Amino acid sequence: MIFIDACFGKPTPYTPIWMMRQAGRYLPEYMAVRDAAGDFLSLCKDYKKASEVTLQPVDILGVDAAIMFSDILVVPLEMGMELKFIKGEGPVFENPILSMDSLDKLSVEKAVKNLSYVYDTIKLTREKLSSDKALIGFCGAPWTIATYMIEGGSTKTYNISKKMLYDNPQFLHAILRKVTNALKLYLEEQIKAGVNAVQIFDSWASALEQNAYLEFGFSYINELVDYIKSQYPDIPVIVFPKGISGFLNKIGGKFDVFGVDWSTPLKMAKETLGSRYVLQGNMEPTRLYSKDAIDDGVDEILSIMRGHRHIFNLGHGILPDVPVENAKYFIKSVQEKSAKYCK
């Protein structure tokens, strides 16, 4: 698999490419399946439909890897929290975790068992996916998941989580430990079901200053990575802590690939981390609105990475109103243009 070879820094005939949120609303085929499922959460829980939308970007765009269709918040949902997706508001947990009593009611074992629909999605997808295409599993990072559990949903200020961090750090650590323990087993079950690589998304890493993030954020990512690599050394692990360009020199661990977000200069990331890790990313997602902008972005990134120790991706998820034709153009452009650098 070209994607797996690239994750381990091996030579490839061209730079492999996939996109975060590639199974998503920009595809009419995805919207048809989502409408048939009824709502987003129902789609996540219907393994046949979830597998169908997982495969769509491979069939329609020609990406080099599929990423299983799910959501990072199914873990706290199946631990025992009540989750709703409200139109215009996003995910909402009706009873946030603000006391030890509420945390004690959440079950790691229950979550790992109840997430069987995710494992079924993986098994079915791996059966249908071409043997030369990788299937990526994923989870949210403990910090990002914990913010939703504490805040009760999306937030711009993280004031409840941050108050807890400084006022009651022991309790925040207790939440993070429990979430991390669930994620260890969750990723392990994904691997047993057939994923070829895993990615850990820390979407809200930038909410914390350096020292706080290293203690409450990245240390738990590394605990998760250490567990997976100790059990499954041949499974590549990708980390994606968004928005921490100010302290990349403080980042290290046993992961294989570091995901670079679009706000981080790729040349700086290469100079800081490129000798230790394969880099993934990092084209600005809005470039996909224009084929000229796609050309410029692809050329710039390829000139920096030169076809080595690199997986092409966007620097965040593809946006819902990107024309499918432009997404196809992006994928084909990377695959064709990168070949000359990989000789």
From Swiss-Prot:
Signal peptide: none annotated. The keyword Cell cycle does not apply. Catalyzes the decarboxylation of four acetate groups of uroporphyrinogen-III to yield coproporphyrinogen-III. Its EC number is 4.1.1.37. GO terms for cellular component: cytosol. Pathway: Porphyrin-containing compound metabolism; protoporphyrin-IX biosynthesis; coproporphyrinogen-III from 5-aminolevulinate: step 4/4. Keywords: Cytoplasm, Decarboxylase, Lyase, Porphyrin biosynthesis. One of its GO terms (biological process) is protoporphyrinogen IX biosynthetic process from glutamate. Gene3D superfamilies: 3.20.20.210. Belongs to the uroporphyrinogen decarboxylase family. It comes from the Bacteria. Pfam families: URO-D. Homodimer. The record marks 71 as: Transition state stabilizer. It catalyses: uroporphyrinogen III + 4 H(+) = coproporphyrinogen III + 4 CO2. PANTHER family: METHYLTETRAHYDROFOLATE:HOMOCYSTEINE METHYLTRANSFERASE RELATED, UROPORPHYRINOGEN DECARBOXYLASE. One of its GO terms (molecular function) is uroporphyrinogen decarboxylase activity. Substrate binds at residues 21-25, 71, 148, 203, 316. It is found in: Cytoplasm. This is Uroporphyrinogen decarboxylase.
